[in-house]
Regions:
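HIT superfamily nucleotide-processing domains
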Residues: 1-117
Length: 117
């Protein structure tokens, strides 16, 4: 089964205890609109299993992470991001990770800049 943490907001969203504006959901992952969008399209993709950050990923999580990566293009297509998009992970304090549950930001519908912040 998927391990969840009762005090984690993303676990609560993944379990449906807190409502979200869902884009995609299956038994492994959830994608929902960010509450503070930084682009015309800004969604978060999370595993339902609680993994704190990329630093906490183990060998047994590799299939799940690969699965998330295969779903990105489907989610992007659903959102009309045919001109491209950016996938971001913030890890740790310096990476500005604010929620301690692994998540990927998918941003699109505007020209991105480089380097990122």
């Amino acid at each position: 089964g998927s391990e969840i943490m009762s005090d984690c907001i993303f676990c609560q969203i993944g379990e449906g205890q807190i409502p979200s504006n869902k884009v995609y959901e299956d038994d492994k992952i959830l994608c929902f609109h960010d509450l503070d969008p930084q682009a015309p399209v800004h969604v978060l993709i999370i595993p339902k299993k609680h993994i704190t950050s990329l630093d906490d990923v183990t060998e047994e999580d590799s299939e799940l992470l690969g699965y998330i990566m295969t779903k990105v293009k489907e989610i992007a297509a659903t959102l009309g991001l045919e001109n491209g998009y950016r996938l971001v992970n913030n890890c740790g304090e310096d990476g500005l990770q604010t929620v301690k549950h692994l998540h990927f930001h998918l941003l699109g519908k505007r020209k991105m800049t480089w380097p990122p912040g």
